[in-house]
Amino acid sequence: EVKLVESGGGLVQPGGSLRLSCATSGFTFSDFYMEWVRQPPGKRLEWIAASRNKANDYTTEYSASVKGRFIVSRDTSQSILYLQMNALRAEDTAIYYCARDYYGSSYWYFDVWGAGTTVTVSS
């Protein structure tokens, strides 16, 4: 069974930091692109970061809203995806999800999602 389990959310003051984790199992972690997506209260899902697969040297990509503040990384020995979040702002308040990125029939889609972890940025 393919599983993604996020952890590390919580309440943090503006300017603070958090590190989210996404423990994965049931598939070959190094073969897949992995993504972080968030959903602020009352808003749509927002893609924020990607970690490409081993074939693409685990290179990363970020949305403009988090670039320079957030860092996505992997522990390939434990099959864990991380999101280091720095200089947090009130607008970073959201449920954060990790997702597996799958290629099929000439298009990409996120085929497996975790249940999410909640981050609240407030003083």
Curated annotation (Swiss-Prot):
SUPFAM superfamilies reported for this sequence: Immunoglobulin
Domain of life: Eukaryota
Presence of keyword Transferase: no
Coiled coil region boundaries: none
CDD domains from the UniProt entry: IgV_H (cd04981)
Pfam families given in the database record: V-set
Annotated ranges, domain Ig-like: 1-114
Alphabetically ordered keywords of this record: Adaptive immunity, Hybridoma, Immunity, Immunoglobulin
Any single biological process term in GO: immunoglobulin mediated immune response
GO cellular component: extracellular region; immunoglobulin complex
GO molecular function annotation: antigen binding
Anything else known: All those sequence appears to be identical.
PANTHER family xrefs: IMMUNOGLOBULIN HEAVY CHAIN
Protein name: Ig heavy chain V regions TEPC 15/S107/HPCM1/HPCM2/HPCM3
Phylogenetic placement of the source organism: Eukaryota, Metazoa, Chordata, Craniata, Vertebrata
